[in-house]
Design a protein with these regions (language model features):
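Anion-binding alpha/beta catalytic cores of soluble intermediary-metabolism enzymes, centered on
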Residues: 1-256, 260-326
Length: 326
């Protein structure tokens, strides 16, 4: 993916090295990626293990290793109890921080890491639960969301939300669109055009599913941020194809042949849509990348390849660097 080269270059030039934690140190794929990231100077990497005996001898110099069993302290427990006040007893907190996904999230919350990549041995829910409970969503947004970066040749688009929110309401949809637009800015997109998708194009259909998209569009247009253009509701053919758009939606203000971002109305549509583009359309799908958290945490597919983990890690490090700069 051509955007990876640009991000790598920016990370290598940065005087500020982000700290990335991998909770799943027992995985050979994680060790390979950790070594690569550290060697290339893309981040300061930390890898978690259960015990000292699990730490391999093939880690490159500079990688920090943490054996959780020997590194649970009262400060961490007290912070977790404060964050989860009224929901946890101390013995429950002690058990939680022994889990690598929770320990990693605590390192991020405590500022000992800037970001986390996890999921080879965890479901998406088990990766995101500690992130949502401990790191929490950013105060600007009502929910967390996800994006896929879809690439084919010189074409590059962002699809959202294809992994997290089952049936977002109009407020959620507007937040999903804004998060994706800000993510696109971080990836150096300019004059960003966002299509709010539906089975209806500006009133050609009706029903609650259409209403929530049109309400989200109205909310977004009131946002009125320079460099961002939101249009809809519209069908996918109208959004993607300029000739169809000219017929179905002549008042649409999109100037590009194709908009940059496609916001799906629910998880059914989004998940099916990105997989059709990937399998039938020949697009490479990078992600999902999680948006809306106060600090970056990204989820890996349990079938992720070394290259998948590497690309996700680079983007996660970059997300952390962008948050540092804001």
């Amino acid at each position: 993916m051509f955007w990876i080269k640009e991000i790598k270059s920016e990370l290598q030039k940065s005087t500020k090295k982000m700290k990335l934690v991998f909770p799943e140190g027992k995985e050979d794929k994680i060790i390979e990626v950790a070594n690569r990231l550290q060697t290339e100077g893309l981040a300061d990497v930390a890898v978690l293990f259960g015990t000292e005996a699990e730490i391999p001898n093939n880690l490159v110099a500079g990688i920090k290793t943490i054996a959780i069993k020997n590194n649970i302290n009262q400060e961490m427990l007290n912070l977790l109890l404060t964050i989860r006040k009224g929901r946890l007893e101390e013995d429950e907190a002690t058990l939680l921080v022994q889990k690598r996904n929770y320990y990693g999230a605590m390192l991020v919350q405590m500022g000992l890491a800037d970001a986390m990549v996890c999921g080879l041995n965890y479901s998406t829910a088990d990766t995101l639960r500690p992130a949502l409970q401990i790191i929490k969503t950013h105060e600007d947004y009502s929910i967390a969301s996800s994006v896929f970066v879809m690439t084919k040749g010189e074409e590059q688009y962002i699809f959202t939300d294809c992994a997290l929110n089952v049936d977002p309401n109009s407020k959620h949809l507007s937040d999903i669109a804004l998060m994706a637009a800000n993510f696109a800015k971080d990836l150096k997109f300019t004059d960003i055009e966002v299509a709010m998708l539906s089975y209806s194009t500006v009133g050609s259909g009706s029903g609650p599913m259409v209403d929530k998209v049109s309400k989200a569009v109205n909310r977004l247009k009131a946002h009125n941020e320079p460099g961002l253009l939101f249009e809809g509701e519209m069908q996918f053919d109208c959004a993607y194809d300029q000739a169809t758009r000219n017929k179905k939606y002549p008042k649409c203000k999109f100037k590009n042949a194709h908009p940059d971002i496609y916001v799906f109305p629910d998880l059914n549509a989004g998940n099916i849509g990105y997989k059709i583009a990937q399998r039938m359309g020949g697009f490479e799908a990078a992600g999902p990348f999680i948006l809306g958290l106060k600090k970056p945490v990204n989820d890996l597919s349990r079938g992720a390849t070394v290259e998948d983990i590497y690309q996700t890690s680079i983007l996660t490090i970059y997300q952390a660097l962008q948050k540092e700069a804001k």
